[in-house]
């Protein structure tokens, strides 16, 4: 964080040192600070507590002003641990909100909520910073055209397409391929759209954050040899951090993404894992500030806080921020205020299925549970819409027949249903796809499949033109031509064995 926007580096101007405040009360991560008359800081201003603890170690704790209490006192929330702070310590008003580094120098690096690098790779090589609190783009700046954000992933583009500048909820448990799907999206946006990504780890486990970083380095999303060629910036506020840091880390990631959109005019992917932790941290801070709790103990400002974050995630005439947010649903209760407030902002949902992952079908996106507001004929066109609906109908009918097949066997079905089951199994396998970021694990080259190719492939399966091909020919291939080539290879191999 730049302590004072009018000075270079992290220095504090002498003018500010003439009127420092003093800590008068500390309750956990909440501090009350008294300032001289007429020198009160504004709401959201960053304060810095400076001094030494009982063993002589220097203290430098950043806080954010949340309330003006009267009698020249303010209440602030600390962004790091408050151990060692004592009453009477000097507090400096920086005169501005928390500001974080932005631009290309952030790619390949890991930051905390204050924009300080935490990856031991030295300081960030940029003088450009931006405050984390800002207004959402004005309506006149918005790009109101509805356009599909092509990901190159067949199951997503066909059945639950993402909106450019939209918000997508990602639902999935542990071990179903959520991280790999996130990394593939980061890789594909860099290749197809020349875009970059920002990953905001909001209240996630430190181990998971470290695993993600290591996997990104392994798959090439973060380039260790030339860090400037990396495709993603990481911002972490883990579970063990104070609630103030977890509440604001999402805004830090969003601020970095906004710079790529507004100044570099790029398409940006913003990942937030987990949006529920943002709400949870806000609830903790609200209670610490003494606000009356609302439904189920959540903060009374839940909708306002969620709206102020989500409304900044949008398309403008310069570029777009498309956000993919992991959503934790407490006790699987979709009516809980936290997920219910999140759903109001989502354009699409991508649901990962443990059943599909168990079958080895990756990405394990559930084609029947995943939804999108973009799947309308007037937006995607009649051809795309009809193909998607027929694919869903075929898979739904197959799902209904599975109990009969399990009890009586496939032979008891009518000829028509047997044909439908065969096509559904081919569709299910054709929805799988080899990923670029999984090449190092699978040995199979990744595939980016354009939307037109995806639609053509599923139309050929539905029309019955490919009924003669074995279903394993459709497993983990790119477009439909690769499936027919794979079928020929399988036939040649079986002939050689004979």
UniProtKB/Swiss-Prot annotation:
Keywords, in A-Z order: ATP synthesis, ATP-binding, CF(1), Chloroplast, Hydrogen ion transport, Ion transport, Membrane, Nucleotide-binding, Plastid, Thylakoid, Translocase, Transport
A Gene Ontology cellular-component term: proton-transporting ATP synthase complex
Record-linked SUPFAM superfamilies: C-terminal domain of alpha and beta subunits of F1 ATP synthase, N-terminal domain of alpha and beta subunits of F1 ATP synthase, P-loop containing nucleoside triphosphate hydrolases
SMART domains registered for this protein in UniProt: AAA
Catalytic activity: ATP + H2O + 4 H(+)(in) = ADP + phosphate + 5 H(+)(out)
GO terms assigned for molecular function: ATP binding; ATP hydrolysis activity; proton-transporting ATP synthase activity, rotational mechanism
GO biological process assignments: proton motive force-driven mitochondrial ATP synthesis
Family from the record: Belongs to the ATPase alpha/beta chains family.
Protein name: ATP synthase subunit beta, chloroplastic
Originating species: Nicotiana sylvestris (Wood tobacco)
Organismal lineage: Eukaryota, Viridiplantae, Streptophyta, Embryophyta, Tracheophyta
Encoding gene, per UniProt annotation: atpB
